[in-house]
């Protein structure tokens, strides 16, 4: 698990909360973005990147709607802009 996800855990064994999922997706998005910059013709990875971005977007919308305090915390911790 990434360092960012470790900071957002609710408890020791937390792997499925929205906050942790967003942190893990953010790491995956950063990795895929770097890969696609190097290999521009890799269409399968670009599809995977779009899926990860859309999944993170849905999770952020859920947090904004249901747990606004946590939403603000996630945005500041992960340096995301909204």
Swiss-Prot record:
PANTHER family from the UniProt entry: RIBOSOMAL PROTEIN S15, BACTERIAL AND ORGANELLAR, SMALL RIBOSOMAL SUBUNIT PROTEIN US15M
Organism: Pelagibacter ubique (strain HTCC1062)
GO cellular component: cytosolic small ribosomal subunit
CDD domains: Ribosomal_S15p_S13e
This protein's name: Small ribosomal subunit protein uS15
One GO MF term attached to the UniProt entry: rRNA binding
Subunit-level organization: Part of the 30S ribosomal subunit. Forms a bridge to the 50S subunit in the 70S ribosome, contacting the 23S rRNA.
InterPro entries: Ribosomal_uS15 (IPR000589), Ribosomal_uS15_bac-type (IPR005290), uS15_NS1_RNA-bd_sf (IPR009068)
GO biological process: translation
Entry keyword Lyase: no
Keywords per UniProt: Ribonucleoprotein, Ribosomal protein, RNA-binding, rRNA-binding
Family stated for the protein in its record: Belongs to the universal ribosomal protein uS15 family.
Record carries keyword rRNA-binding: yes
Role noted for this protein: One of the primary rRNA binding proteins, it binds directly to 16S rRNA where it helps nucleate assembly of the platform of the 30S subunit by binding and bridging several RNA helices of the 16S rRNA. Forms an intersubunit bridge (bridge B4) with the 23S rRNA of the 50S subunit in the ribosome.
Gene: rpsO
